[in-house]
A protein has these predicted regions:
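Amphipathic alpha-helical segments that line or abut small-molecule/effector binding pockets
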Residues: 29-44, 48, 90, 94, ...
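An amphipathic alpha-helix adjacent to DNA-recognition modules
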Residues: 1-21, 37
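Short secondary-structure transition hinges
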Residues: 41-77, 105, 109-112, 117
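Amphipathic alpha-helical packing segments from all-alpha helical-bundle domains
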Residues: 14, 18, 60-86, 90-94, ...
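Short alpha-helical functional segments enriched in proximate histidine and acidic residues
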Residues: 19, 23, 42, 133
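C-terminal regulatory/oligomerization modules of transcriptional regulators
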Residues: 107, 138-146
Length: 146
């Protein structure tokens, strides 16, 4: 039974990554935002698979290499787009991922049914707000907002 469960998770993961790839290739959003919007789209279109991948009990599991690579890619995109160092880019990603995961989870559980335009605006607002904590208007770290 465990082997079947792992196979289903593997196939669900393939479908998730295909959804992310389609979102990125569509070029409707900057690359980093496209990843978050793809995550939310997957939650809306594949509710049960989203729950299986991202809302199951993982207390006995190790992180996969794919998850680690996803974080590295996200951090690199943030560093490239903002000029932030690795630690700040990592924190920005974690904080925004929590926001995006919250929206995706509420959509996957039918708590919310928001249009993609509203979600896009909210993701942009959260990104800009979190980024502002790390960068002041002149591009230097602002120690007063930490």
């Amino acid at each position: 039974m465990e082997e079947l469960r792992k196979s289903v998770i593997c196939k669900a993961s393939e479908l998730y990554y295909a959804c992310l790839e389609r979102e990125c290739e569509a070029a409707n959003y900057p690359p980093y935002k496209a990843m978050g919007m793809g995550y939310i789209r997957f939650a809306a279109e594949e509710r049960e698979l989203f729950r299986l991948l991202f809302m199951r009990d993982r207390s006995g599991e190790e992180k996969s290499d794919g998850e680690t690579e996803d974080v590295k890619k996200s951090v690199e995109l943030i560093m490239k787009g903002t000029g932030l160092g690795m630690n700040d880019a990592f924190m920005l990603h974690l904080e925004l991922w929590i926001f995006v995961h919250g929206i995706a989870s509420m959509i996957a559980t039918s708590y919310l049914n928001w249009e993609s335009e509203l979600v896009s605006r909210m993701v942009s607002d959260a990104y800009e707000g979190i980024k502002a904590r790390f960068i002041s208007k002149d591009g230097k770290e602002d120690k007063n907002v930490r």
